[in-house]
Amino acid sequence: MFYVEILGLLPEMAEAEVKALAELRNGTIKERDYLLVVGNVENVEIFERLGLAHEYGILLGSGDDVRDILDLVRGLEWKEIIKGTFAVRKEVMVNCAHEVKNLEKIIGGIIHSQGLRVNLSKPDTIIKVYCGRKLWIGIRIREFRGKEFDERKADRRPFSRPIALPPRIARAMVNLTRATREILDPFMGTGGMLIEAGLMGLKVYGIDIREDMVEGAKINLEYYGVKDYVVKVGDATKIKEAFPGKTFEAIATDPPYGTSTTLPMDRDELYKRALESMYSVLEGRLAIAFPSDFDALDVAETIGFKVIGRFYQRVHSSLSRYFYIMEAR
């Protein structure tokens, strides 16, 4: 069993990201308790790709009350679970339904009584206890620190433009496509989506109608160590012209919204033509963002897409958007 602690930002989208990655390893989500998602998966290392998560780990068990969780702790052979020193960390979620004061100390004492050493400052193993509707306990494998994503924000790139998706969201969009080999971004801009996909080991393809953006994206990809890429000047409404005879396993993209750029045609017409172009080269899934005042559902389904997910985000007072997950039928 695994657990993932997702971000409070876009929680439904974060849960869908976990589900998409779990499915790549024949896994399923069993339950979500506020910001804790638990389930089964053949190999938890797939979660190294996560974007909208605080951490993930191995789930040891759960309890309906404190007595249950303490009985579970007493029944485990901790010398077979813990490597080196340990510390217990407690996470009290908004929906915590239990009295958990000092619970981490009590659990730590039980484990220590089995002959294991505590190190609160630099433990080799971190045991996580979560309080929600139920109580959960697991072993942390990886914590995703904000700093590593901040280093890839638009203003930290050598070639920068102010309007770009946050790296965590871009990464989640790539994951929602369930890509395993390659991905295309037909509105690549400065390459943020391609950077995240490339760092996951995917081959990345991108086009942009502006030559300066293409050259800038190359600079950014090289800066972050992404080597397996093909980027060129191209029109998102004419992808086949940019890549003759090529189809793509997955597409993830964030088209211009029309507020920060001069569009080459009417905004809604651009979106429609771009969706038609993407449909013509797509083998699997598309993850795409649109402003909330664009009727993407109707347009996409008319083209032939099956919309399998939609997630709302209010960015600021003058912009709200939906992230869509679509499949080519």
Curated annotation (Swiss-Prot):
Coiled coil: none annotated. CDD domains: AdoMet_MTases, THUMP_AdoMetMT. Residues 40-143 form the THUMP domain. SUPFAM superfamilies: S-adenosyl-L-methionine-dependent methyltransferases, THUMP domain-like. Its main location: cytoplasm. Hyperthermostable. Remains fully active after 2 hours of incubation at 80 degrees Celsius. Keywords: Cytoplasm, Methyltransferase, RNA-binding, S-adenosyl-L-methionine, Transferase, tRNA processing, tRNA-binding. GO terms for molecular function: tRNA (guanine(10)-N2)-dimethyltransferase activity; tRNA (guanine(10)-N2)-methyltransferase activity; tRNA binding. Gene3D superfamilies: Vaccinia Virus protein VP39. Its EC number is 2.1.1.213. It is found in: Cytoplasm. GO terms for cellular component: cytoplasm. It catalyses: guanosine(10) in tRNA + 2 S-adenosyl-L-methionine = N(2)-dimethylguanosine(10) in tRNA + 2 S-adenosyl-L-homocysteine + 2 H(+). One of its GO terms (biological process) is tRNA methylation. NCBIfam families: TIGR01177 family methyltransferase (TIGR01177). Belongs to the methyltransferase superfamily. Trm-G10 family. Monomer. This is tRNA (guanine(10)-N2)-dimethyltransferase. The lineage of its organism: Archaea, Methanobacteriati, Methanobacteriota, Thermococci, Thermococcales.
